[in-house]
């Protein structure tokens, strides 16, 4: 493990599995310290976090398209943040990235599931958690590929369609 700046921060973790709607007793906050990065890792200061309906499903111990969040693990979600230190060949300090990290002030990442925000970005960064992120891509491909809508077709979207349906 290489020497890096020491960072103390807060993270939200899954304390217990919810039964019904999630409550504040299911999630707790703890202090975490990072004092080194391995080769291939980067440290991200998270600036935006998603709060998507899928997170509640990940809190359950049910198989899904994503594995359940383990007890005592950080709550997984999409984030947007700035790389503050990197030992990864594809990312440099100052890069703005979005991807799957967690509800924490900082994330240590191996770069998997991370995408750089273009340097010439002119859009608010939170767009990368909605229209430009997984939610937006799901909505786009749902309409263009799965639904195969054509000119003149009518689309009715339920208010219960969630984040994807809102796009």
Give the location of each predicted region:
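Short structural boundary motif marking the start of a folded domain
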Residues: 7-12
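Short polar catalytic/cofactor-binding loops
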Residues: 15-20, 49-51
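Short glycine/threonine/proline-enriched tight-turn/helix- or strand-capping micro-motif at secondary-structure
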Residues: 21-33
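Glycine-rich beta-strand-centered segment in the early N-terminal region that forms part
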Residues: 33-51, 59-103
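NAD(P)H dinucleotide-binding glycine-rich loop of Rossmann-like/cofactor-binding domains
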Residues: 77-82, 93-159
